């Protein structure tokens, strides 16, 4: 339903500068929050889940920014008012950069909760993100196609690092009570108690 609202209907979100907001909501906030609720049956972990959901949404929106960055002239020619058409490449290039930085800042309470070792994850992500952003600033047209994949891979790297940080460093009771319904010894044998 939301995919249809994104591109079709009487007021397609992607044609009116709302595509990025829709991606943050429907590729980040909604799926992460409801997946957590479905797996745990509770909203108790919201202080970590809400920032995580927004971070995932921001990183997913960066894929859309690269796509719209590439297609700016074509979109403008057919009156498709993406954020890149509205604000320009320079501004949206900055938004791309800051989306990744803000996403990592949103994760600081969780990284701090997990352990100092888990801080490797956002540092590695930021290095990848800044490298991709530098390429974005220098590229136009078809040169941006590989950056779509790199931006998506950056999101995947973030998600995998977050997963491993949680698996390796969550206290046993958190894994059992909130994430794995007391099946942590079967589902999550690496959930090592932290004293």
Predicted regions and their residues:
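Transmembrane helix-loop-helix
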Residues: 1-8, 47, 97-143
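Small-residue-rich segments of transmembrane alpha-helices in multi-pass membrane proteins
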Residues: 21-36, 56, 84-89, 149-162
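Membrane-embedded alpha-helical segments that form the functional core of polytopic membrane enzymes
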Residues: 1-4, 44-66
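Transit-peptide-like, low-complexity N-terminal presequences
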Residues: 177-195
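Hydrophobic alpha-helical transmembrane segments
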Residues: 21-25, 49-54, 93-97, 119-121
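Solvent-exposed interhelical
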Residues: 57-101
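Intramembrane alpha-helical segments
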Residues: 1-43
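Helix-coil boundary and interhelical linker segments in multi-pass alpha-helical membrane proteins
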Residues: 31-53, 105-118, 163-182
């Amino acid at each position: 339903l939301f995919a249809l609202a994104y591109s079709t209907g009487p007021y397609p979100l992607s044609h009116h500068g709302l595509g990025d907001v829709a991606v943050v909501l429907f590729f980040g906030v909604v799926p992460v929050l409801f997946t957590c609720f479905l797996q745990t049956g509770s909203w108790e972990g919201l202080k970590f889940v809400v920032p995580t959901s927004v971070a995932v949404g921001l990183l997913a929106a960066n894929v859309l920014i690269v796509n719209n960055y590439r297609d700016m002239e074509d979109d403008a020619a057919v009156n498709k008012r993406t954020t890149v058409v509205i604000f320009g490449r320079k501004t949206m290039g900055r938004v791309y950069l800051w989306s990744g930085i803000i996403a990592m800042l949103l994760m600081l309470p969780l990284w701090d909760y997990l352990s100092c070792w888990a801080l490797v994850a956002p540092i590695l992500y930021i290095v990848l993100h800044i490298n991709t952003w530098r390429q974005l600033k220098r590229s136009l047209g078809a040169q941006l196609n590989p950056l779509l994949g790199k931006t998506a891979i950056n999101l995947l790297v973030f998600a995998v690092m977050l997963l491993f940080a949680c698996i390796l460093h969550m206290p046993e009771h958190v894994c059992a009570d909130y994430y794995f319904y007391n099946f942590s010894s079967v589902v999550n044998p690496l959930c090592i108690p932290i004293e």
